[in-house]
């Protein structure tokens, strides 16, 4: 674990963050301190950022551009469970336009992405089917690249995922077990 003394004060455009939970590609935590010229973030704000695979200490430094604000009505469990797969589901739903009442088949090798994409399609009025359909929404590399194309798109996508969580779109989708996701006390 990294102690408070070994993590320096944040510099220009950098945030010092205290992680609270990690899962499915994202870490959620709170702002511990904000460096000069950081706009929109203050100490104790809830935030999320992409997990880089590194060991996470008690405090970490991240560029402000790599951090997303988390609304107060979204839990840590919802962020780590739904944000990553939700961004992919959002991109998949946007790849093929469909209308209310259309039959849609969802194809993904990731069961959680398939379940979340189906839930999102149903919330937009589609009938999700396992057989022949008006169109198929396929989880492929091109669609996933749309998710990671840039921070502006990531931030915009995160807002839509958080709104879908608030509307209850993913209520039927089981979250990640929180006991395996905790990173800090």
Region roles according to the model:
Residues 4-10, 151-185:
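C-terminal hydrophobic helical "lid"/dimerization subdomain
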Residues 6-54, 108, 132:
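Glycine-rich beta-strand-centered segment in the early N-terminal region that forms part
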Residues 24, 28, 82-86, 114, ...:
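Short alpha-helical patches at coil-to-helix transitions and adjacent helical residues
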Residues 28, 86-89, 158-161:
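A general structural signal for well-ordered alpha-helical segments in protein cores
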Residues 47-109:
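NAD(P)H dinucleotide-binding glycine-rich loop of Rossmann-like/cofactor-binding domains
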Residues 83-142:
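Mid-domain Rossmann-like dinucleotide-binding core that forms the NAD(H)/NADP(H) cofactor-binding site
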Residues 122-123, 127, 131-132, 142-152, ...:
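NAD(P)H/NAD(P)+-dependent Rossmann-fold oxidoreductase cores
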């Amino acid at each position: 674990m990294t102690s408070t003394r070994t993590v320096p004060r944040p510099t220009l455009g950098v945030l010092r963050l205290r992680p609270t939970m990690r899962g499915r590609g994202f870490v959620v935590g709170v702002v511990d301190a904000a460096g000069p010229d950081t706009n929109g973030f203050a100490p104790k704000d809830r935030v999320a950022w992409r997990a880089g695979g590194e060991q996470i200490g008690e405090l970490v430094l991240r560029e402000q551009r790599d951090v997303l604000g988390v609304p107060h009505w979204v839990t840590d469990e919802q962020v780590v469970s739904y944000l990553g797969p939700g961004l992919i589901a959002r991109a998949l739903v946007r790849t093929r336009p469909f209308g209310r009442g259309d039959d849609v088949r969802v194809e993904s090798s990731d069961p959680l992405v398939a379940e979340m994409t189906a839930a999102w399609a149903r919330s937009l009025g589609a009938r999700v089917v396992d057989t022949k359909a008006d169109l198929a929404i396929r989880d492929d590399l091109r669609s996933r690249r749309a998710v990671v194309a840039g921070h502006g798109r990531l931030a915009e996508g995160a807002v839509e995922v958080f709104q879908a969580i608030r509307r209850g779109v993913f209520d039927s989708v089981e979250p990640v077990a929180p006991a395996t996701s905790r990173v800090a006390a």
